[in-house]
Amino acid sequence: MDKLTPEQRKKCMKASSKNKGTKPELLLAKYLWALGLRYRKNDRSIFGTPDLSFKRYKIAIFIDGEFWHGKDWDIRKYDIKSNKDFWISKIEHNMNRDKKVNDYLISNGWVIFRFWGKDVLKNPEKFSLEIQKAIYERCVR
């Protein structure tokens, strides 16, 4: 049983959800910065609010958490133990939203990068160089 009233819990959750960036986001941002690349974080003027973006080059970067965005979903959805219907619906909604965001941005000339958070943690240099290459290709076309 929760010691806080629903209103108090809502206030606490809202206060703690200020987006400061996840570890994978911060790590990739650090590598991009070291390459001399200047990005925007969570730019709400771009549909889907990418984690990092280069508006000038129309490049949007999303670093997705494996659970929240349904990595290996066909297998992992059966691992959920409690409140199964809620979580399956929630994650599938997130996956559908990700697809809509991708489709919209691509149809408007954007290059989309979607990386899994754990992959970024393992090899941030690889992903930062991939982004750098895409920016270069956008510059010379």
Curated annotation (Swiss-Prot):
CDD domains: Vsr. Keywords: DNA damage, DNA repair, Endonuclease, Hydrolase, Nuclease, Restriction system. It is an enzyme of class 3 (hydrolase). GO terms for biological process: DNA restriction-modification system; mismatch repair. Its EC number is 3.1.-.-. Disulfide bonds: none annotated. GO terms for molecular function: endonuclease activity. The keyword Transferase does not apply. The keyword DNA repair applies. Pfam families: DUF559 (PF04480), Vsr (PF03852). Belongs to the Vsr family. May nick HpaII sequences that contain T/G mispairs resulting from m5C-deamination. If unrepaired, these mismatches can lead to C-to-T transition mutations. The very short patch (VSP) repair process counteracts the mutagenic process by repairing the mismatches in favor of the G-containing strand. This enzyme is an endonuclease that nicks double-stranded DNA within the sequence CTGG next to the thymidine residue that is mismatched to 2'-deoxyguanosine. The incision is mismatch-dependent and strand-specific. This is Type II nicking enzyme V.HpaIIP. It comes from Haemophilus parainfluenzae.
